[in-house]
Amino acid sequence: MRKFFIAILFLAIAVAGNAAETLQSPDSKYNFVFEQKDGRLVYHLDYAGKQVVEEGELGVNIDNHLVESAMGIPVDNSKVWTQGMEVIKVERAAKDEIWNPIYGEYSSIRDHYNEMVIHLMKGGNHDNSGNGYDKRQQYLFDIIVRAYDEGVAIRYHFPEATNGLFMHITDELTSFRLAPGAEAYHFAWAQSHANKVKLLKSEKAWKEEAERPLTLQLANGLYAAIGEAALSDFVRGKLKLKADNELQMSMFQSADIITAYDMPWRFIMVGEKTIDLINNKQMVLNLNAPCQIADAGEWIRPGKAFRVCRLDKKTLYESVDFCVDRGLQYIELDAGWYGPEMKMSSSALKVADNRDFDMAELCAYAKSKGIGVWVYVNQRALYQELDKILPLYEKWGISGIKFGFVQIGSQEWTTWLHNAVRKCADYHIMVDIHDEYRPTGWSRTYP
């Protein structure tokens, strides 16, 4: 990998009172300002001298009263968990790096940003030394802000605390208050129609939360997109209308974490034209960790697949030949090859008895022609048999699995899904995720 790296880490700066902290993008177009206002954590965002976010709130709400009571720690009865937090210090850094994806539109991607980490605390004192368990009501909370030339991203980090508390996050406070007149291209789910609506409670569309990324046309003529990056073990976020002209991140449900922990990134990118938002999409990849598959370039091959629904031997072998003639790279066996996909009793460890082909022989024939084989497997079978499926499919010579009808949204299913992808990588099996899954750039980490 060809890369250059410039990192500047300034010494921690003690912050007193409610002093504002500013962060700019490398090209100085984005200007992010953090401050404390009436005990709340808020920010403002401009782009090229034009206002983007008038004011937005930062933070989460946490209900830890059961754990606090059980561990003999004073119960935090705050209505807003981040109310009255103290800024301990602010750290700044900059990074400029080139990395090379193994596929996609670009052979190289620049990861260039300025970063500000705001360290906050509530309860206890500044002494976090020692390894022993203590019973102080002390919570640590970091706000990480990155300013790219492509946009600005915010992440919440929970450092490990000496009192060892688990965190039960009930909702997220992150909001985006825009100037009156902004309009959103609202869509509620993957295959729904996008409606251009004003950010007003009177608009019927806002009875449902908006999917992300959400595209906006601002009153000053700019376009913006709000989205989520690096989601792998948290609940899915959507956007709800908190008040007229004010959007708020909405969690699918509550989440439980163990510190130290990073929440997903929330980002906003801005452009003079809508095409600018598309051209800046690489920022979403940059907000994710580098590739974790050492030999990814040796076996991950993008390509076009021919979907086969008539699952008999003659059709499957003819489909392989069709791919050769048409310059396609894969065939994909659709639902039904191992039995009724919606039945928990259907095992994806063997071809259904009413089928007349052998999977290993099919894969061998396809390989001899330079064609790979994908198979559809419903989540019901994946959930029950994944650890048995993967070594078998690698032995058969399967190239990839199309995950069917996966559950999404909850922390449980989000974590399960991403762990399943990790396991597939261990057996050199590619993954295509069906249905309501929303990419958040994790394909950089696991291409």
Where are these predicted regions, by residue range?
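Positively charged n-region of N-terminal signal peptides that target proteins for export
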Residues: 1-4
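Short amphipathic alpha-helical segments and helix-helix/interface helices
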Residues: 173, 213-215, 320, 363, ...
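An acidic-aromatic substrate-binding cleft motif
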Residues: 258-330, 334
